[in-house]
């Protein structure tokens, strides 16, 4: 047999090296007009706008002044992720020792280093000791928070956070915040503002962190048009900041304005020198530039008389739907009569997360309720639907964008905040309409509630009225009389079966004066498993299972479905007449 006969036939068409070349990523095709503005025609103008928007030079100077920052992580939100490669490239050009560390292969003694210098990589620092840049994509939790979990995977020394942020204090890593310099159509904003408000209206100008740089000049232009009752806000680190937090590219000086009030990460300024308080803000309308996340929007709706949001992407007033406070009040009533509470941890980087978890667990136990704890990155409907025994969820997340509000009614079980849970578990449910998202404030409130419950006389095991269903619930506090299970059974009472105790307690809902919510939930299910270890009379065959015919057909119409449909059609009386297709 010849060698030609041993060659297998070709199973595909002719392929060359060009066939396997990946499609090149075209930078100019991305629509960056929303944040970089119009006028980008070539790669040079794009890089110049990138350097200005992300304050690359200021960032490089800050990193060069901290030689201890060797592993640098850049965190981008999803809407700015396509700029990450250009930002890393421009930053590398200003960090000389970093390029030597990223050399793909060791250079020879007679060659030039890939960084462009005349020194060889053999004479420079080892690549393991040089600086490295990492890009953090697909953050574990809300993009406004610093992703310490992802940064620890690469042993980061510093996190550079770009875009909108909540400025919540983090536990360990130093943080550098760069909001950016987004483009704003000022003429469009002023036109929509004048159409909506009268000149004597009391309006507060607020924006997401990147757009806050436009508020002072925008307030000055509106004042020239006759609006005299205006205040605006600017971003600032909270009163209890992280000592290693730094904001670059933002000036905190306002020479022509007066500081009126400070609350959280916002400082209020105005042209008139007067003092404001939280009660006086209730008389102001809020004009917000940029569509804030739902938790932030709900929080602002409790602080001002009304909220109007300007969508910077569509360049129009956002029309909703917006989250409502009435749904929060209903969810609190559900949590009041819930027997099992799921603590959903939606952040691990906030400074008071662990303290809040401990306080919530202590509060839930003191109220006689069961709890489970879950750590889920970016919770969705499918993830939480796997835990049916949970009656209500308590989400621990950032108040800016880490709280799941479910205003579209997609989740199977209600989701409440720690503050709402503390109100629901109080002896008397009373709510002033305030919506607190600060962890430290909630912890102080839980400590006060535990102090009141310690001196109170425990109530008897009486049913509790459910305001949602209008019925009485008898097992809302299953651990109210928590006793350890002690079983004493004499040897002579034990039969030959080794599962006698299981038989005795398998159908019981109360064991040792303690309500078993798991047993109650299991008995309420239509399907309880593939079989029983102790019930010998329940479809048990010693010689083996009988082979039975299973389902047949496709998923859209199994055989028994087809039979039922035919049977139903046969029962429907037929009518005479002609059907016209329109």
Swiss-Prot record:
Subcellular location field: Cytoplasm
Principal subcellular localisation of the protein: cytoplasm
UniProt-listed InterPro entries: DHP2, DPH1/DPH2, DPH1/DPH2_1, DPH1/DPH2_3
Gene3D superfamilies (UniProt xref): Diphthamide synthesis DPH1/DPH2 domain 1, Diphthamide synthesis DPH1/DPH2 domain 3
Co-factor binding details: Binds 1 [4Fe-4S] cluster per subunit. The cluster facilitates the reduction of the catalytic iron-sulfur cluster in the DPH1 subunit.
This protein's GO CC annotations: 2-(3-amino-3-carboxypropyl)histidine synthase complex; cytoplasm
Cofactor(s), names only, from the UniProt record: [4Fe-4S] cluster
GO BP of this protein: protein histidyl modification to diphthamide
Keyword Signal among UniProt keywords: no
One Pfam family it belongs to: Diphthamide_syn
Origin superkingdom: Eukaryota
PANTHER family, A to Z: 2-(3-AMINO-3-CARBOXYPROPYL)HISTIDINE SYNTHASE SUBUNIT 2, DIPHTHAMIDE BIOSYNTHESIS PROTEIN
Assembly information from the UniProt record: Component of the 2-(3-amino-3-carboxypropyl)histidine synthase complex composed of DPH1, DPH2, DPH3 and a NADH-dependent reductase, predominantly CBR1.
Family indicated by similarity: Belongs to the DPH1/DPH2 family. DPH2 subfamily.
Chain's role: Required for the first step of diphthamide biosynthesis, a post-translational modification of histidine which occurs in elongation factor 2. DPH1 and DPH2 transfer a 3-amino-3-carboxypropyl (ACP) group from S-adenosyl-L-methionine (SAM) to a histidine residue, the reaction is assisted by a reduction system comprising DPH3 and a NADH-dependent reductase, predominantly CBR1. Facilitates the reduction of the catalytic iron-sulfur cluster found in the DPH1 subunit.
Protein's UniProt name: 2-(3-amino-3-carboxypropyl)histidine synthase subunit 2
Taxonomic source organism: Eremothecium gossypii (strain ATCC 10895 / CBS 109.51 / FGSC 9923 / NRRL Y-1056) (Yeast)
Taxon lineage: Eukaryota, Fungi, Dikarya, Ascomycota, Saccharomycotina
Gene name of the record: DPH2
